[in-house]
């Protein structure tokens, strides 16, 4: 479909149910219909490290996946208000993962992601930073990652989740069904 200029967007029921505002704003952004929002330029923002609770509150309101466990949380502040958050998790040997980035969807934040990432690199001097992007929302050729100098390492196959079909519907990651964490009864019969 890409050759015809068509992009399909898959939205899960629980995303729309729990994050309707974020989903609708993402669609507007993809369609280029965000131009009537106030613009905030990175040069007018200060970068401040924040605690996990503050990052969690912001990401719950502005990121479709909410908060992800992080070691470092940076925020972009404009006129005393947090307008963007970028979080990182550390691994061994100065390797890091960029776990979340979100800006306040009430604004068009120009260059803020790049400024947050540059600040992180200057403060923490990582040897390597990796990140994962949901292909449903991130174009593979022109996106925040490529603008910040990331290179595409690979594309993972689609994964699965379990669905608890109560109302409201809930998708549950397969990680929650490992035998180590489930109460499993094992029966044996010996003759």
Stretch-by-stretch model annotation:
Residues 1-2, 145:
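Hydrophobic alpha-helical packing residues
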Residues 34-128, 133-143, 147-148, 152-160, ...:
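A conserved beta-strand-loop-helix scaffold within acyl/acetyltransferase catalytic domains
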Residues 172-179:
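Short, amphipathic alpha-helical interaction segments positioned at domain boundaries
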Residues 29, 56, 83-84, 188-190:
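Short amphipathic alpha-helical surface micro-motifs
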Residues 2-52:
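Basic, glycine-rich
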Residues 179-191:
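A conserved mid-domain beta-alpha-beta active-site/ligand-binding segment of alpha/beta enzyme cores
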């Amino acid at each position: 479909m890409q050759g015809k200029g068509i992009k399909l967007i898959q939205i899960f029921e629980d995303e729309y149910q729990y994050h309707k505002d974020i989903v609708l704003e993402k669609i507007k952004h993809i369609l280029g219909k965000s131009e009537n929002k106030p613009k905030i330029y990175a040069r007018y923002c200060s970068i401040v490290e924040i605690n996990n609770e503050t990052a969690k509150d912001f990401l719950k309101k502005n990121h479709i996946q909410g908060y992800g466990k992080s070691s470092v949380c940076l925020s972009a502040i404009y006129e005393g208000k947090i307008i963007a958050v970028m979080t990182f998790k550390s691994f061994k040997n100065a390797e890091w993962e960029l776990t979340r980035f979100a800006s306040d969807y009430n604004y068009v934040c120009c260059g803020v992601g790049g400024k947050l990432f540059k600040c992180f690199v200057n403060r923490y001097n990582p040897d390597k930073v990796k990140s994962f992007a949901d292909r449903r929302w991130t174009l593979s050729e022109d996106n925040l990652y490529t603008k910040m100098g990331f290179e595409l390492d690979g594309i993972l196959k689609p994964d699965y989740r379990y669905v608890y079909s109560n109302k409201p519907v809930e998708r549950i990651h397969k990680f929650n069904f490992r035998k180590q964490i489930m109460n499993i009864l094992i029966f044996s019969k010996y003759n």
